[in-house]
Amino acid sequence: MKGGWHEARAAGSYTLARQWPPRFDVSADARFPAVRRGRLARQIRQDLWRALKGLRGFSPVIQIAAAEDGLTVTAGGRLPTNVPGVETQIRELLQDPAHRARWIAWAKERDA
């Protein structure tokens, strides 16, 4: 646990969750280029939390898996009640060009 967040790294995957074990009651997926998984997950988690912080009981989870052409990100988390439109909000956040550009720039590999 790092700063109240659980991190799990495995071959080809990375998971960041507030509660363990992670659970997706709501989620959306998106594809990303190959970048540093931990940095990408933390940036998405921050903006996901900002977008959904008004949802009582929401606990974010970000899961990133290696794919042939980059990464597959699953963003969402625990939500004790069914709230219409939440998955759409998450999907729109993951597809927002301004957010994506910032996340990718922050998570790109840096030369030493």
Where are these regions (language model features)?
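Short, charge-patterned binding micro-sites
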Residues: 19-24, 61-72
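Helix-rich interaction surfaces within compact, conserved domain-sized segments
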Residues: 67-112
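N-proximal, solvent-exposed amphipathic alpha-helical segments enriched in charged/polar residues
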Residues: 1-6, 38, 42-46, 89-102
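Residues at beta-strand starts and edge strands
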Residues: 12, 56-58, 69-73
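Residue-level recognition of well-ordered beta-strand positions that form the cores
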Residues: 13, 29, 63, 74-78
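Short histidine-centered catalytic/ligand-binding loop motif
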Residues: 27-37
